Amino acid sequence: MKFGWVNVIGDNWEEKKKIVTTALESSIPVVVAEPEDIEKIKELGNIKVASHSLDADIVLVNKNDNIEFLKEAKNLGKETAIYIPIESKEDEEFASEVARFGFVDNIILEGRDWTIIPLENLIADLFHRDVKIVASVNSVDEAKVAYEILEKGTDGVLLNPKNLEDIKELSKLIEEMNKEKVALDVATVTKVEPIGSGDRVCIDTCSLMKIGEGMLIGSYSRALFLVHSETVENPYVATRPFRVNAGPVHAYILCPGNKTKYLSELKAGDKVLIVDKDGNTREAIVGRVKIERRPLVLIEAEYKGDIIRTILQNAETIRLVNEKGEPISVVDLKPGDKVLIKPEEYARHFGMAIKETIIEK
């Protein structure tokens, strides 16, 4: 996932304060600031500060500082970062060396009189290292270039904002860069059968969904069904466009980063993935999870010769999505209907996709 930091630049505290509050409002997780500003920044809201101080959330040093300071910070459990201006080949080599120390979490690179070549070299060199590469940039356009270098791009950017609008635009860029696309396919329903009662989970999010959006949920890790949000008008109950009635406690749900969780694991503050009929995704924050005993229905479908299943609440307001991208209620579902699923080639272990033979029935 791409991230962005903002440099707190200003001649006085009022100017700096506006940068910090805009960063907070734009969901920027980290600001880089002078040590004397740390306490005042913390009074404005819950945001991490990177600075040359052990009081900072991320302890930051410059290239010419004593790097042992970072080792001390790491021993105290702090996240660490080093700022390296790239002015020569020797600076590139130093950045590469620093990444191998084992106590540097973030390397911030500033290019002076250069194009993207040094960044390309370092991204290629540090691809498998446990260190984040952050590019110092002066505009959102530069940030976009940094994020896309060699396809992988830098992990993050440190923006030196010219104005407050730059910060807002960076936030929008990060949101766009972090959108995942999932490949959906069509399965054919073979059985719809009431099976009695069980504990089912409703996911109430901090986002409003629209027609065609829902979440990917299923009993088997190898295929998740697109369960529609409660956005469809009906004569029985008001719409709940923030909600997906997801299924029983055992079911998997697809979360950001192509990870899954059990529905029973979800809690307020967790992030889930909203998916539309075309496979476009966006993150949502869980606001509440409700687990209640309700009547259930088994849905069985065939996909490329394989039988896949999921279980949902047996109620008119619970819907899957058909091959046309339209919501279809489980009470209207019948054998032969086509529904959208996300097939998965790999098995799952602690929510991670792995190459392993697992039989699910």
From Swiss-Prot:
Q: Name one GO biological process term.
A: aromatic amino acid family biosynthetic process
Which UniProt keyword terms apply here? Amino-acid biosynthesis, Aromatic amino acid biosynthesis, NAD, Oxidoreductase
On the tree of life, the source organism's domain of life is Archaea
Q: Which residues form the signal peptide?
A: none
State the reactions this protein catalyses: 2-amino-2,3,7-trideoxy-D-lyxo-hept-6-ulosonate + NAD(+) + H2O = 3-dehydroquinate + NH4(+) + NADH + H(+)
Q: Which GO terms describe its molecular function?
A: 3-dehydroquinate synthase activity; dehydroquinate synthase activity; NAD binding
Q: What is its EC number?
A: 1.4.1.24
Q: Which enzyme type, at the first EC level?
A: oxidoreductase
Q: Which Pfam families match?
A: DHQS
Respond yes or no to whether keyword Transcription is given for this record: no
PANTHER family per record: 3-DEHYDROQUINATE SYNTHASE (PTHR33563:SF1), PTHR33563
| Function statement | Catalyzes the oxidative deamination and cyclization of 2-amino-3,7-dideoxy-D-threo-hept-6-ulosonic acid (ADH) to yield 3-dehydroquinate (DHQ), which is fed into the canonical shikimic pathway of aromatic amino acid biosynthesis.
Entry's family note: Belongs to the archaeal-type DHQ synthase family.
UniProt-listed NCBIfam families:
PRK02290.1-2, PRK02290.1-4, PRK02290.1-5
Q: What is this protein called?
A: 3-dehydroquinate synthase
